[in-house]
Curated annotation (Swiss-Prot):
Residues carrying sugar: N38, N75, N146, N258
Motif Internalization signal per UniProt: ranges: 329-332
UniProt keyword Zinc-finger present: no
Organism from which the protein derives: Aotus nancymaae (Ma's night monkey)
Ranges per topology, Extracellular: 19-303
Name of this protein: T-cell surface glycoprotein CD1b
Ranges annotated as spanning the membrane: 304-324
Length: 333
């Protein structure tokens, strides 16, 4: 656990010293997904994230990082970045080779997939907590705590054997310790400061209503869409008047391509109960001016067609009568 210097706390948290004062991400992690098809073929994908925002990719062909933002390097120099790329490049190649060499000993049947996540997060009081977890086929397998490999209960005896093997590589464990407890915290602080303008920026949400697939006879699925907001925390609810409507279902908050967020709130109601319902959106960027959209039954396509065709027919009829009268007057001697 690492404590932030007081000066940096003041920069990141001008309104207080808790993580809630920073309106943006508070953790960084890298994700590794290694797929093993057989004893000679493996593929690894990697990415780096600030909470749910991806800021790095990994080019497997060149063995280099892809920086998705101008400030994705944080305050690291080009030399430091190159050294880290070399560490990850050697690790990825060595990891695949070691897994394939020991797959038979650990009774791992092809094909299989190994997932890993490692990083550090900012907690209340200015503490930074580092973590590393590994999974096999989507199930917890092991973790690293205090520079020691800890097998997960779900991993059984296989995880215990793998941890015993890993702990024999003390040189590698020392590199892991340095990356987790020194490099990651320093990078996290630097990238949060470098990307502060983007990460703490506020974008007002846009909201609109639609109807979803009918849940059943005589029922409606009301959908309230909210998009384009930043930061991520948002409150959306269907309401009859000033009370929250029971049964409102919130989907996952999903990222947009421009680093804003999208959320939809749905409500299954009887068709006769939809009138008078509204969708209310609260967000810090609105400064108390909530968005309120009232539900009204959408105009049917048939009504739209009638609204266009009937006036057109009347116009044509009037033109025809005018033309016939004009012709009749011209025929009078």
């Amino acid at each position: 656990m690492l404590l932030l210097p007081f000066q940096l706390l003041a920069v990141l948290f001008p309104g207080g010293n808790s993580e809630h004062a920073f309106q943006g991400p508070t953790s960084f992690h890298v994700i590794q997904t290694s797929s093993f098809t057989n004893s000679t073929w493996a593929q690894t994908q990697g990415s780096g994230w600030l909470d749910d925002l991806q800021i790095h990719g990994w080019d497997s062909d060149s063995g280099t990082a892809i920086f998705l933002k101008p400030w994705s390097k944080g305050n690291f120099s080009d030399k430091e970045v190159a050294e880290l790329e070399e560490i990850f490049r050697v690790y990825i190649l060595g990891f695949a080779r070691e897994v394939q060499d020991f797959a038979g000993d650990f009774q791992m049947k092809y094909p299989f997939e190994i997932q890993g996540i490692a990083g550090c997060g900012l907690h209340s009081g200015g503490a930074i907590v580092s973590f590393l977890r590994g999974a096999l086929g989507g199930l917890d397998f092991l973790s690293v705590k205090n520079a020691s490999c800890v097998p997960s209960p779900e991993g059984g005896s296989r995880a215990q054997k793998v941890c015993a093997l890993i702990m024999q590589y003390q040189g590698i464990m020392e590199i892991v310790r340095l990356l987790l407890y020194k490099t990651c915290p320093r990078y996290l602080l630097g990238v949060l400061n470098a990307g502060k303008a983007d990460l703490q920026g506020k974008m007002k949400p846009e909201a609109w209503l639609s109807s979803g697939p009918s849940p059943g006879p005589g029922r409606l699925l009301l959908v309230c869409h909210v998009s384009g907001f930043c930061p991520k925390p948002v409150w959306v609810m269907w309401m009859p008047g000033e009370q929250e409507q029971q049964g409102t279902q919130l989907g996952d908050i999903l990222p947009n391509a421009n680093w804003t967020w999208y959320l939809r709130a749905t409500l299954d109601v009887a068709a006769g109960e939809a009138a008078g319902l509204s969708c209310r959106v609260k967000h810090s960027s609105l400064e108390g001016q909530d968005i309120i959209l009232y539900w009204s039954n959408p105009t049917s396509i048939g009504s739209i067609v009638l609204a266009i065709i009937v006036p057109s027919l009347l116009l044509l009829l009037c033109l025809a009568l005018w033309y016939m009268r004009r012709r009749s007057y011209q025929n009078i001697p």
